[in-house]
Regions:
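Active-site microenvironment for binding and transforming phosphate-containing groups
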Residues: 3, 7-135
Length: 135
């Protein structure tokens, strides 16, 4: 193979996966197994619940303590989690260039006419599939 490869991967990054650093570990695995160069990688963070709607409890706050800057204390005394920021920070820590990380910045909870939202629909949702294609 030449120096430029076309490897694709995807990972689900809810709060558990995010605090367990799934984005960072996915990049590390791709580098280890395929010899990828993170500086040449592209990443996309797709639609998901935004920090505007993602109120979390103390269990999540404690589990994500390493990423304290991803939690915002709201006037009601509750914390909201920014999964987009948490995963961006992990991708950057793995060596991806900031300009190579695209975030859809689309909240599924605020856009229920377009997406299912487990949180907004109290678990009574349809399902979404994600595929990665080469053009």
């Amino acid at each position: 193979m030449g120096s430029e490869m076309c490897i694709r991967d995807r990972a689900h990054a809810g709060w558990r996966g995010s605090v367990e650093e799934i984005a960072l570990k996915t990049v590390q695995m791709m580098c280890r197994h395929y010899g990828c160069n993170p500086e040449k990688m592209l990443a996309a963070i797709g639609p998901s619940i935004g920090s505007c709607c993602y109120e979390v409890d103390d269990k999540v706050l404690t589990a994500g303590a390493k990423y304290r800057e991803c939690f915002t204390l709201k006037p009601n005394g509750k914390y909201h989690l920014d999964l987009w920021l948490m995963n961006r920070l992990q991708l950057e820590a793995a060596g991806l260039e900031r300009g190579n990380i695209h975030c859809a910045a689309t909240c599924t909870c605020d856009n229920r006419e377009l997406f299912f939202s487990y949180r907004a629909e109290l678990g009574k949702t349809g399902r979404m599939g994600v595929s990665i294609c080469r053009r």
